[in-house]
């Protein structure tokens, strides 16, 4: 604890194995085939499709239900993947209307009446969570738990937050400039 984290400043080519191959990041997303882009100052390439990319949508759904976000018991990564593939959930809102597919869920391998009932109860119990957890659950880039708390304190209500986020997207607005 308290140690200095070293910064990578270059490659020591003399230490590289002779048979090593230069890594080339993919120019196209392996999920949706959209062009990838590496923003200046960032270490990773990103798919430019956003929520249109199935892989990004699935990962956002996983984050949304994760322990530090909505913390929905019984709705783990594998189940999210299966429900997305079957078209049962496509976005955050679908999670809260999944009860409409109760009969369909009960027929799935590994899911029975009791586990589906427990899942629906768990989802129902999370209809109200703290504002900071909601902000964190949205998976906004560079908004972790600490920034989510700060945003919740700043805006107090979801409506205030929503209004400011709409302003921030408006190129004619003075917000966040």
Regions of interest found by a model, annotated:
Residues 1-7:
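Flexible glycine-rich surface loops and low-complexity tracts that mediate binding to linear polymers
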Residues 3, 12-177:
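Accessory alpha-helical DNA-binding modules that contact the DNA backbone or grooves
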């Amino acid at each position: 604890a308290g140690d200095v984290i070293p910064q990578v400043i270059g490659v020591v080519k003399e230490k590289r194995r002779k048979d090593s191959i230069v890594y080339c990041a993919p120019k196209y997303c392996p999920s949706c085939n959209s062009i990838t882009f590496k923003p200046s100052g960032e270490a990773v390439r990103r798919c430019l499709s956003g929520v249109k990319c199935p892989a990004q949508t699935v990962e956002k759904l996983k984050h949304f239900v994760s322990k530090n976000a909505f913390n929905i018991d019984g709705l783990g990564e594998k189940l999210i993947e299966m429900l997305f593939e079957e078209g049962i959930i496509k976005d955050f809102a679908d999670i809260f209307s999944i009860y409409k597919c109760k009969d369909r869920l009960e027929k799935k391998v590994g899911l029975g009446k009791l586990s589906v009932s427990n899942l629906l109860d768990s989802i129902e119990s999370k209809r109200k969570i703290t504002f900071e957890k909601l902000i964190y659950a949205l998976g906004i880039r560079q908004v972790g738990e600490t920034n989510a708390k700060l945003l919740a304190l700043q805006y107090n209500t979801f409506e205030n937050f929503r209004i400011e986020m709409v302003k921030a997207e408006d190129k004619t607005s003075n917000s966040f400039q």
